[in-house]
Amino acid sequence: MALLQISEPGESPAPHQRKLAVGIDLGTTNSLVAAVRSSTPEVLRDAEGQALLPSAVRYCADGKVVIGRQALAQQAADPFNTVVSVKRFMGRSLDEARASGAPYEFVDAPGMVRLRTAQGELSPVEVSAQILAVLRQRAEDVLGDDLVGAVITVPAYFDDAQRQATRDAARLAGLNVLRLLNEPTAAAIAYGLDQAAEGTYAVYDLGGGTFDVSILRLTKGVFEVVATGGDTALGGDDFDWSISEFARASLGDAPLAPADRRTVLVAARAAREALSQASEAPLRATLQDGRQLNLTLTQAQFEQLAEPLVRRTLDRARSALRDAGLAVGDINGVVMVGGATRMPVVRRAVGELFGTEPLVDLDPDQVVALGAALQANLLAGNRLPGEDWLLLDVIPLSLGLETMGGLVERIIPRNSTIPVARAQEFTTFKDGQGAMSVHVVQGERELVSDCRSLARFELRGIPPMVAGAARIRVTFQVDADGLLSVTAREQSTGVEAAVSVKPSYGLSDDEITRMLADSVAQADSDARARMLREQQVEARQLVESVRAALAADGDLLDADERRVVDERLQAAAAAQDADDADAVRAAVQALSAATEDFAARRMDRGIRAALAGRKLDEIA
């Protein structure tokens, strides 16, 4: 996402001290932390060289808390106190948590379910905070200093409660959240898709326990998630289970002990992972009773086992396309996320569905964290070599809209701190006006023609009223990403229309400097031009209102009065397009003076009509 370095014209950009910020993929199965080092995003590893941190936390009766691989190893022995896949419970209610089928004792609590453990009742926020704290400590150990903040990724379908729960967990872990970033958007950023002009992309995310598919539309630097889909009960674990069932069939009818089932499952996972690089893989294990599992699993056999599961993911992908109103041919690229996408059968099926080779250059386990790291580095204010943009939390150029006469009404002035929101009321220009065109512009000049056009949209459904009676509230809101949303709402009916745009898209430092310099150099001429346009608008409004008044109540004037008003009206109509502000002002003043008595008589007639047939006590 192109963001901008902002400085006053003529001011040299001051060198910035590098600030440490990280990207965190808080995953259902595994979590990672990444940072930009030597201009390249990379995943940070622990002291043992491991990048992936299993998202598992064990709460021991003696008060000890074990996190990661050691906790996961105790899951079978201590399932009630070893919390895995806690991400599923973030921001969820008791009923939603119980529906997951997880083996925990859930407790109802205001706002969010809690889990009963050997160390008492804990919320998913507290459990997630334990995982985030380990990642924060890892980052500070590797980078050698404190962090200024983190970008944390969340599924695109997370609602407000789930997103707030993620923020709360980060705060408990001592992390300053720079941004919550949608996981598919993070993956797209890692591949540099945000630098493309526009396009529509699919993100196919097959993790250990869940499958998500997202359709992203990139328009002028703005990523929009247009559709999501998936299956929260489908992931790499299900492929392992299919292999383990295949293996168990060779062991006879005798039931397997729980420990043996786990042993076979571990062997199945090893075989699946080996098949990502080989045409066949050994499937071997020794059971507690001495029986031996000794098979060779071929790629063809595995593909037959995997076919129903792969088909389920493709069905979800087709459904997401339908929801987005798109065809397969509309997709410009497919990003693969999640360790399970290493399977050749998955990559081939996805490529056949979308008719294009999926993007697989980056490690699918790491791609989301890498994209988050790039975003975090940008938000921290660090400049990569060769880049001319830097995020500063201010508006570089004023934002406003076009009013009558081609004038700019500034809503948010330049250098306003973001995020920011401003609202202003506008009204109609003509009687019975049922629609209003909203033209959003950017710049410091007084005339729309000298500013940068950002977007246009129409508000329809304004109830018929006399000119100036309708009240349309226009709200400009710029979020922390620099994304501008403009909403126009008619106050009496509630009808509204809106548009979103990235004001910084396609705007360089040089162009900002030029626009600011032009506004200074042309300040006097712009002021004169604005004054002329305002006089012309006033003239048009007066001419239209006088014509309407004459049509309705012209009988209130005698012949001489009508002749004078008509002459002044004709002069004002001729002057309304003149280039001399003084001449326009004089014509307006002359017409106003000629119609003062006429306006008073019209008011008297209106009052008499309103009071006709009413008693004095009714009026009081």
From Swiss-Prot:
GO terms for molecular function: ATP binding; ATP hydrolysis activity; ATP-dependent protein folding chaperone; unfolded protein binding. Coiled coil: none annotated. Keywords: ATP-binding, Chaperone, Nucleotide-binding. This is Chaperone protein HscA homolog. Pfam families: HSP70 (PF00012). The keyword Ribosomal protein does not apply. It comes from Bordetella petrii (strain ATCC BAA-461 / DSM 12804 / CCUG 43448). NCBIfam families: HscA (TIGR01991), PRK05183.1 (NF003520).
